Amino acid sequence: MKTLKIKKVSFPVAKKYLLQSKFRNQAVNLKETVRKIILNVKKNGDKALIKISNKIDKTEFKTVTEASFNKSDLKKNYEKLDNAIKKNLNFIKKRIINFHKAIKTSDLKTKDGIFNLLGQIHKPIDRIGLYAPGGKAVYPSSILMTALVARVAGSKEINLFFPSSSEKAKTLMLGTAHLAGITNAYNFGGAHAIAAMAYGTETISKSDKIFGPGNNYVAEAKRQVFGDVGIDSFAGPSEVLIISDKKKGFEQLAADLIAQAEHGEDSKCIFIQIGKGGLGDLFKELERQVTEAPRGKTIKTALEKNSMFIQVKNLEEAIEINNLVGPEHLQIIYKNFKESLLKRFIAGAIFVGENNTAVLGDYAAGPSHVIPTNSAARFSSPVSIEDFLVRTSVTEIKSIKNLSLIHISEPTRPSI
């Protein structure tokens, strides 16, 4: 492998670049392509879904049924899994369920002198469509991080879509789907899968809301169907921003950057070094690990084309850069870091401490790893139980006499 070509930039240069929004994901060229895919599936249903999948993903499906898996199929695949994998999946399942059960979403019921009941009630969204990313790698954890939360919320029907992959990877995804309580699974990915969830086909039922991360095409498809169906967010390629004041010992931090970069060539990695020194040793460690990594080519492209390595003077400058990015994952390695500072950071998820990593949070902590990307952390949040619920306002008046206490007048129209 050729030498890793990554450069460091100063605080002023990084700030100017980020203020111009050049680091945000640009998917303008995808819009028309995705629009045509959605219209095709919406109009032609199963036929379009099969044709697009066979063309893009090189599958050989003749019917949607060939790519469909019911509860019995999912159980059979779970039984094929290695016991160690089952143990790991069940460990993660327990943590996710325990975390989200601890989030309280109680109904509100009150009254006043006019209304005998004023309040809001919660009910689960009935039909959920879940997308689990794939392609060069598969992510069974994405199934657990969404489906289990939907189950805690009480959703009745949960349908999973994931891209075509090897038989071994497919068995893992389908087995995980069984553990997560999936109703049906479909071996379709990309914008056409989102369209099938949003509008349904002859075989696939329409979803009320779509969840799950994906690539640029998936994010753009979710953007275009929003309004006809609910979505969790426009999550795109994986992101990590690391703030560190370490001066030596970069093995773990290099691995953390690589863990995000290996998701795809469009993954974004930012490293902010507080104080002088450090980056040179980090670059050497990255070079070593990328050379040894199984997906070194993908990692190298992500680090060279979509990443930034920034030297700043202090934590204040680091916070400023971070908040211009609003990353999906933020790791903070800073001596004597104070918890009171956490609310100053804009990020989808924050991982504090040298022994804590985004990977740990993504797979085993408990909170969902479906997190806002592309600066959306400024106005949105990670997927949680509230996202699988709808609130309805409720009022009740028992006595007609109470109506006389309501004073409503027609607003005066301005004269012209």
Where are these regions (language model features)?
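Single conserved hydrophobic/aromatic residue that forms the stacking wall/gate
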Residues: I406-I416
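Conserved NAD(P)+-binding/catalytic subdomain of aldehyde/semialdehyde dehydrogenases
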Residues: G181-K268
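Short acidic loop-to-helix transition motifs that present clustered carboxylates
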Residues: I114, S165-A169, F188-A196, F337
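N-terminal Rossmann-like NAD(P)+-binding subdomain of aldehyde/semialdehyde dehydrogenases
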Residues: M1-D126
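Short acidic-hydrophobic, aromatic-tinged amphipathic segments that line or gate anion-handling sites
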Residues: T3-V9, A185-G189, F309-N314
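Conserved small-residue-rich beta-alpha loop and adjacent elements
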Residues: T110-G175
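NAD(P)-dependent aldehyde/semialdehyde dehydrogenase
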Residues: D266-P382
